[in-house]
């Protein structure tokens, strides 16, 4: 399997003099084309891990390899071109006067020819269903629309990895679902690898694999079907379980014959529809 991201024994603290590490020996790898989510309580080290991978902090112990190449101070700018990061607040990412200017900004910094830029801007905005808004001012967009434009700005750069750092946490449920639908479509279209940092367990449930962090360490790694099968394990970690898990538990109490394994919302709807036909 082709490992596009490898993290080995990351140790990091924000203050050199501090006795407290934000990360304590974090290690994992991600295969090309995989969608991996990192979940955990506030302060567990999720976002710190993501930002170290993106080269936003220079001093740390351990190794980060991107597409087989070791991340160093000398090559950080070149390797960062392989990563696109979507942050929590889209307003913090806007720099252009119009939507199309903003999507083009990163490409201008990379010296991409103008003809190619125009082509990529339209292609990226079309992919996130925002082409009709390309001359609009970003400030006049809704939260969900702003985040879609932020995603367009990333995919226009043609990265190999997209990191979502709590990128849906400021959206309402409808906006959150729309953004996740768009990113899933883009992932398949461009064969991207996705690392998602999230508090939303329903969002994490659509991942290929989930890493659970606590106090700067990865304490569990599993597929969603395994991790969410029992609510007791999640409560012990200090987290909730996805909506479908709680619903299945209540339905069993009311006499529904349901499997013990975890089912996503779509899978549960399909199963219940079959039973009620």
Curated annotation (Swiss-Prot):
Query: What GO terms fall under cellular component here?
Result: ATP-binding cassette (ABC) transporter complex
Q: Where in the cell is it found?
A: Cell membrane
| Entry superkingdom | Bacteria
| EC code | 7.-.-.-
Binding of ATP occurs at 40-47
- Per UniProt, what is the membrane topology? Peripheral membrane protein
All copies of domain ABC transporter, residue ranges: 5-240
Q: One Pfam family of this protein, by short name?
A: ABC_tran
Q: Name one GO molecular function term.
A: ATP hydrolysis activity
Q: Which SUPFAM superfamilies does its entry note?
A: P-loop containing nucleoside triphosphate hydrolases
Q: Which UniProt keywords apply?
A: ATP-binding, Cell membrane, Membrane, Nucleotide-binding, Translocase, Transport
Class of the enzyme per the UniProt entry, highest EC level: translocase
InterPro entries according to UniProt: AAA+_ATPase, ABC_transporter-like_ATP-bd, ABC_transporter-like_CS, ABC_transpr_CbiO/EcfA_su, ECF_ABC_transporter_ATP-bd, EcfA_1, P-loop_NTPase
Protein purpose: ATP-binding (A) component of a common energy-coupling factor (ECF) ABC-transporter complex. Unlike classic ABC transporters this ECF transporter provides the energy necessary to transport a number of different substrates.
Record note on quaternary structure: Forms a stable energy-coupling factor (ECF) transporter complex composed of 2 membrane-embedded substrate-binding proteins (S component), 2 ATP-binding proteins (A component) and 2 transmembrane proteins (T component).
Q: Which family does it belong to?
A: Belongs to the ABC transporter superfamily. Energy-coupling factor EcfA family.
What is this protein identified as? Energy-coupling factor transporter ATP-binding protein EcfA1
């Amino acid at each position: 399997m082709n490992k596009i991201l490898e993290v080995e024994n990351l140790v990091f603290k924000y203050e050199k003099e501090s006795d407290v590490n934000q990360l304590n020996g974090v290690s994992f790898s991600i295969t090309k084309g995989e969608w991996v989510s990192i979940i955990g309580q506030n302060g567990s080290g999720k976002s710190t891990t993501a930002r170290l991978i993106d080269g936003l902090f220079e001093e740390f112990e351990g190794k980060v390899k991107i597409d087989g190449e070791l991340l160093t101070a000398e090559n950080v700018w070149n390797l960062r071109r392989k990563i696109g990061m979507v942050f929590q607040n889209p307003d913090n990412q806007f720099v252009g006067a119009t939507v199309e200017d903003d999507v083009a900004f990163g490409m201008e910094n990379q010296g991409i020819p103008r003809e190619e830029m125009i082509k990529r801007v339209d292609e990226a905005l079309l992919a996130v269903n925002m082409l009709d808004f390309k001359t609009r001012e970003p400030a006049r967009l809704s939260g969900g629309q702003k985040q879609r434009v932020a995603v367009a700005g990333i995919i226009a750069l043609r990265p190999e990895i997209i990191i979502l750092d709590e990128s849906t946490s400021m959206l309402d449920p409808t906006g959150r679902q729309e953004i996740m639908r768009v990113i899933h479509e883009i992932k398949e279209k461009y064969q991207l690898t996705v690392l998602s940092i999230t508090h939303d367990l329903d969002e994490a449930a659509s991942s290929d694999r989930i890493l659970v962090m606590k106090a700067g360490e990865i304490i569990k790694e599993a597929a969603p079907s395994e991790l969410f099968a029992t609510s007791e394990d999640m409560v012990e970690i200090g987290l909730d379980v996805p909506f479908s898990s709680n619903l299945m538990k209540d339905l069993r109490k009311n006499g529904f014959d349901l499997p013990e394994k975890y089912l996503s919302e779509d899978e549960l709807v399909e199963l219940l529809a079959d039973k009620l036909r």
